């Protein structure tokens, strides 16, 4: 019977991820807008339009409509269908393999932290690299909002036309790094907290809620600087050039040459705190996202 259930962590992870994405996506949109603003070397996003998460939420809703908060939701759903399914399925599969080889459980019955971290890091890196194109589409659509893009297929066509297949893999390095950091912190911390709280709360919703909240704070602190770099790299595109009234595009963007260059220029031009732009919406979103995800996941496991 155990063999039959091997596919279930993958399906449960995907369904729970998509459910959580729908519930928290507007917060993610405000985070993306905050992270790309204030880039002094990019005139399109040099202005500080939003003072914070609440201001961004209000202005986007008022100026672009409530639907703009869900710009990019479909590539986000596609991302979770791949990223979420592969990440959580791979994580729990690797844990099972580690357990079978005696690498997971200590003599006192507790789980080994290093084993959990390695399983989570591997799962995060693999899944994020595979899902990177959907992440690029999501960021592009979030930045421009409703009415300024042609939808999922239109955005895909524009990237392919002007940037080629490589355009869909912009930011794959920091994306994988971010996924490794989040997975290495979030999943082991959740499992650790859940185990520690088992005597007080049992394997119930209260335990899942508290464990999710603690896990989200740690992952937000660790991952936000990488997330800022990732978002900026994904959003950069060929610079528009007008010649004889015809708009063309340069062969390559000249804003950032890579992750390190983006980090250096961001700190130099905007200061070190710029790497934590969007931290509040990141944490505010991670909390509910993890709570929705893990509660959904735990409930699905019962069937």
Swiss-Prot record:
Location in the cell: Mitochondrion inner membrane
GO biological process annotation, one example: sensory perception of sound
TM spans (from-to): 10-27, 72-90, 112-131, 171-190, 209-229, 278-297
UniProt keywords, alphabetically: Membrane, Mitochondrion, Mitochondrion inner membrane, Repeat, Transmembrane, Transmembrane helix, Transport
Tissue and organ distribution: Expression levels are higher in the head than the body.
Any one annotated GO CC term: mitochondrial inner membrane
InterPro entries for the chain: Mit_carrier, Mito_Metabolite_Transporter, Mitochondrial_sb/sol_carrier, Mt_carrier_dom_sf
Family in the record: Belongs to the mitochondrial carrier (TC 2.A.29) family.
Protein name: Mitochondrial uncoupling protein Bmcp
Organism annotation: Drosophila melanogaster
């Amino acid at each position: 019977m155990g063999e039959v259930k091997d596919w279930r962590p993958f399906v449960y992870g995907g369904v729970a991820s998509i459910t959580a994405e729908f519930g928290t996506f507007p917060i993610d949109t405000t985070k993306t807008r905050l992270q790309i603003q204030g880039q002094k070397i990019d005139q399109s996003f040099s202005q500080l339009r939003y003072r914070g998460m609440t201001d961004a939420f209000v202005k986007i809703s008022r100026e672009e409509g409530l639907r703009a908060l869900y710009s990019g939701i479909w590539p986000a759903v596609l991302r979770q269908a791949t990223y979420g399914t592969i990440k959580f399925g791979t994580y729990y599969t690797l844990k099972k393999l580690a357990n079978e080889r005696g690498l997971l459980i200590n003599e006192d019955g507790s789980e080994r932290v290093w084993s959990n971290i390695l399983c989570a890091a591997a799962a995060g890196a693999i899944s994020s690299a595979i899902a990177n194109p959907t992440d690029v589409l999501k960021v592009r659509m979030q930045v421009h909002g409703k009415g300024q893009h042609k939808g999922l297929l239109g955005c895909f066509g524009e990237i392919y036309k002007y940037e080629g297949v490589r355009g869909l893999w912009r930011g794959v390095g920091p994306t994988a790094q971010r996924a490794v950091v989040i997975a290495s912190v979030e999943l082991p911390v959740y499992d650790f907290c859940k185990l520690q709280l088992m005597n007080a709360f049992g394997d119930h919703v209260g335990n899942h809620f508290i464990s999710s909240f603690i896990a989200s704070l740690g992952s937000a602190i660790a991952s936000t600087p990488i997330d800022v770099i990732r978002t900026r790299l994904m959003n950069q595109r060929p610079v528009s050039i007008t010649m004889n009234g015809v708009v063309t595009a340069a062969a390559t963007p000249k804003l950032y040459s890579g992750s390190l260059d983006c980090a250096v220029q961001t700190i130099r031009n905007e200061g070190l705190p710029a790497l934590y732009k969007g931290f509040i919406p990141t944490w505010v979103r991670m909390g509910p996202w993890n709570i929705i995800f893990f509660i959904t996941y735990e409930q699905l496991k019962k069937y």
